[in-house]
Amino acid sequence: MSKKLASPLSFLPLYNLLSAVGWSYLLYLVISLYPKVGQPAFFYQTKNVATLVQCGAIIEIINSFLGVVRSPLLTTVAQVSSRLLVVLGIFQLLPNTSGVQSVVYISLLLAWSITEIVRYLYYFFMLVFKNGAPKILILLRYNLFWILYPTGVASELRIIYCALNAAESQYSLLYKRILIAAMLAYIPGFPMLFLHMVAQRKKVMKSLRSSFGKKLI
């Protein structure tokens, strides 16, 4: 039974495509603007764009809650909220901390943007095209995470850690403790997500090898 294809202009494919465009723009800024202005000027010129693009992921929580997608709600909330904490809780509320003004901000944007460009384009192709995503996109989706996931998480943790003292002095001890609790949540959260991707990769690579073998016969 063939899968039901969606129109490119229907909500879910369009959301994925626009999200890919948004992250592509951020990657373009890293490549084109950062070498010209450096840090911390680059952070101040791009933090609002990064916040806006990342906040678009709130729609993923809504989609999961309504059953529009099959992603588990708790997993989606955990993934999105950790990033929202960074863009809203640090970029917007604590913009003068050392983490976001350093090269760590660049490594964060590179890890986030490349990951999301590939992910959203993968979803778009899977929804719209009969043959699904191009093989190169599948390979990128299930191999880049080896480098990009640890890089992104390490960058997030560094940015949060550098904001701890400012969180207490500018807001309250409670806010500092919230940030610490968020950091501790990465201990079970990251291995769980990473191992899930490893398991998914194993299935996908096996399927690709099987498909490639059939074409040779």
From Swiss-Prot:
Superkingdom, taxonomy of origin: Eukaryota
Catalysed reactions, semicolon-separated: a very-long-chain (3R)-3-hydroxyacyl-CoA = a very-long-chain (2E)-enoyl-CoA + H2O; (3R)-hydroxyeicosanoyl-CoA = (2E)-eicosenoyl-CoA + H2O; (3R)-hydroxydocosanoyl-CoA = (2E)-docosenoyl-CoA + H2O; (3R)-hydroxyoctadecanoyl-CoA = (2E)-octadecenoyl-CoA + H2O
Variant or mutagenesis effect after changing R119A: Exhibits a moderate fatty acid elongation defect
Transmembrane region(s): 12-29, 48-66, 77-94, 100-117, 143-160, 179-196
Phenotypic consequence of G152A: Greatly inhibits the fatty acid elongation cycle. Displays normal KM but reduced Vmax values
Impact reported for R141A: Digitonin sensitive, reduces structural integrity of the protein. Greatly inhibits the fatty acid elongation cycle. Displays a higher KM and lower Vmax values
Effect caused by changing E60A: Digitonin sensitive, reduces structural integrity of the protein. Affects the substrate specificity
Motif residue range(s): Endoplasmic reticulum retention signal: 214-217
Residues exposed to the Lumenal side: 30-47, 95-99, 161-178
Keywords assigned: Endoplasmic reticulum, Fatty acid biosynthesis, Fatty acid metabolism, Lipid biosynthesis, Lipid metabolism, Lyase, Membrane, Transmembrane, Transmembrane helix, Vacuole
Gene Ontology CC annotation, any one: endoplasmic reticulum
GO molecular function: 3-hydroxyacyl-CoA dehydratase activity; enoyl-CoA hydratase activity; very-long-chain (3R)-3-hydroxyacyl-CoA dehydratase activity
Function of the protein: Catalyzes the third of the four reactions of the long-chain fatty acids elongation cycle. This endoplasmic reticulum-bound enzymatic process, allows the addition of two carbons to the chain of long- and very long-chain fatty acids/VLCFAs per cycle. This enzyme catalyzes the dehydration of the 3-hydroxyacyl-CoA intermediate into trans-2,3-enoyl-CoA, within each cycle of fatty acid elongation. Thereby, it participates in the production of VLCFAs of different chain lengths that are involved in multiple biological processes as precursors of membrane lipids and lipid mediators.
PANTHER family: VERY-LONG-CHAIN (3R)-3-HYDROXYACYL-COA DEHYDRATASE
Protein name listed in UniProt: Very-long-chain (3R)-3-hydroxyacyl-CoA dehydratase PHS1
Organism per entry: Saccharomyces cerevisiae (strain ATCC 204508 / S288c)
